[in-house]
Amino acid sequence: MDKNLLEAVKFDEKGLVCAIAQDAETKRVLMVAWMNAEALQKTVETGFAHYYSRSRQKQWMKGEESGHTQKVRELRLDCDGDAIVMLIAQNGGIACHTGRESCFYKVWRGSAWETADAVLKDEKEIYGSTH
């Protein structure tokens, strides 16, 4: 592991740090996930976003199933060292597992959350019927 890469990052008690994927061109926030030290190291080594799945308890590369990979253009660490922003190029224009550009597709409209973004590709087309 690269000590210079990891020493400034404040991983939580579970060894994770918040990772935000933001489109490098539009600046739209596409998703928020978690990274452990291994996922961060793999991201730097490969140039593609890797995360740690809390539900599956394993590291994964974004797009390994869907093909919607995230090419990292820049990594930024916040002032407290406990959150990372990755400026990325989103392959296929879909970051969300629901088939939308962003995971942040719901908008509060005063009394309810409304879906603001259309599905670009159906989940079954992306992952097959087993997802």
Swiss-Prot record:
Its main location: cytoplasm. It is an enzyme of class 3 (hydrolase). SUPFAM superfamilies: HisI-like. One of its GO terms (cellular component) is cytoplasm. Mg(2+) binds at residues 78, 80, 82. It comes from the Bacteria. Its cofactor is Mg(2+); Zn(2+). Zn(2+) binds at residues 79, 96, 103. GO terms for molecular function: magnesium ion binding; phosphoribosyl-AMP cyclohydrolase activity; zinc ion binding. Pathway: Amino-acid biosynthesis; L-histidine biosynthesis; L-histidine from 5-phospho-alpha-D-ribose 1-diphosphate: step 3/9. GO terms for biological process: L-histidine biosynthetic process. Coiled coil: none annotated. It catalyses: 1-(5-phospho-beta-D-ribosyl)-5'-AMP + H2O = 1-(5-phospho-beta-D-ribosyl)-5-[(5-phospho-beta-D-ribosylamino)methylideneamino]imidazole-4-carboxamide. Belongs to the PRA-CH family. Homodimer. Catalyzes the hydrolysis of the adenine ring of phosphoribosyl-AMP. This is Phosphoribosyl-AMP cyclohydrolase. The gene is hisI.
